[in-house]
């Protein structure tokens, strides 16, 4: 699904900057829960989607609580962080017209979860101690969330006779560009640091 691996320069920055990594990861879990709730409101007539998103929102908030617990254990002071460009960069490609919009939102969700999963796989063995252990523990859930979003996307595509494979390929190209282009700020889904370019 993903066209490119996480750049080595990003992994090096993540290992050296676990404070920002954890704070932003907590933000990502909150955003994931918020997105699930927003989809429930946007497609209120779809009870199948509502069931999936309700469960997802609860699980993402439990993950948020796990991250915050570790933040407290490590005596990290929380701070407000500006959002990275990754999710917004993907969502700019989302259609405004239904039912294409719903398909795009599901595909977008799948790519975010897929990249999270890939980064957990890279970070878990690279960061010793409780941070790496947490990422290893969360990895299976991210893979499950990716599959759920893909299944929902296929369901929308079949119901509305939309092109699934082509649209996934278009988002894959955008996603690859977002994670390989240098970034001025370090975030969980950012590209490699601009200073490393």
Residue ranges and their predicted role:
Residues 1-197:
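Non-heme di-metal
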């Amino acid at each position: 699904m993903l066209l490119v691996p996480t750049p080595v320069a990003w992994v090096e920055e993540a290992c050296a900057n676990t404070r920002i990594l954890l704070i932003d990861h907590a933000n990502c879990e909150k955003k994931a829960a918020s997105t699930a709730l927003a989809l429930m409101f946007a497609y209120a007539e779809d009870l199948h989607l509502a069931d999936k998103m309700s469960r997802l929102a609860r699980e993402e908030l439990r993950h948020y609580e796990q991250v915050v617990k570790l933040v407290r254990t490590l005596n990290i002071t929380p701070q407000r962080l500006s959002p990275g460009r990754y999710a917004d960069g993907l969502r700019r490609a989302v259609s405004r017209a239904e039912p294409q919009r719903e398909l795009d939102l599901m595909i977008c969700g799948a790519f975010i979860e897929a990249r999270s999963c890939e980064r957990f796989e890279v970070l878990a063995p690279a960061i010793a101690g409780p941070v790496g252990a947490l990422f290893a523990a969360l990895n299976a859930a991210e893979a499950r969330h990716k599959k759920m979003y893909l299944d929902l996307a296929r369901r929308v595509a079949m119901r509305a006779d939309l092109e699934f494979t082509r649209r996934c390929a278009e988002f894959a190209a955008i996603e690859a560009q977002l994670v390989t282009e240098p970034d001025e700020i370090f975030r969980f889904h950012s590209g490699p640091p601009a200073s490393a370019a």
